[in-house]
Amino acid sequence: MKTNLSSQITLNRVSPRYFRPENAFERSVLTRLEKIPTDIYESPEEGANQIALDIAQMIRDKQKAGRFCVLALAGGNSPRNVYSALVRMHKEEGLSFRNVVVFNLSEYYPLASDAVNSNLKSLKEMLLDHVDIDMQNVF
């Protein structure tokens, strides 16, 4: 019996019906036991773009309502593609971050916020320095 099958599972061998259901009924059948809604994409870029679209829509909805959009964002490499997509939307589509309040999700203690390995520094380099956010709204 083979025990290490996870290394052999790839999306090009799994039928799309298992990770991209065609309708709400099929989705409910696949996700009925999940506690957290989960979407699977064929590539990290496709997933990052969808997350960025969801964040952008939330920002726009809050702008229309005249309210702040509060986000808790992580530093590090994992969200890099999401932040790149948000910066692109800001530059190409005019997505404004003026109504956004950002909380840095985590930080190393007692690391200074401008230290090389600081999560806040990486968040600034990947996203905040490239958009029109008011830095007084960054915590």
Residue positions per predicted region:
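N-terminal glycine-/serine-/threonine-rich phosphate-binding loop
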Residues: 2-70
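Ligand-binding beta-strand-loop-alpha-helix segment within the catalytic cores
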Residues: 19-35, 95-139
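Acidic/polar N-terminal loop/beta-strand segments that form early-domain functional surfaces
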Residues: 41-43, 74-76, 105
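Short, glycine/acidic-enriched capping/hinge loops at junctions between secondary-structure elements
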Residues: 51, 82-85, 113-115
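Short, well-ordered amphipathic alpha-helices
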Residues: 55-59, 81-91, 124-127
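Glycine-rich N-terminal segment of FAD-binding domains in flavoprotein oxidoreductases
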Residues: 65-92
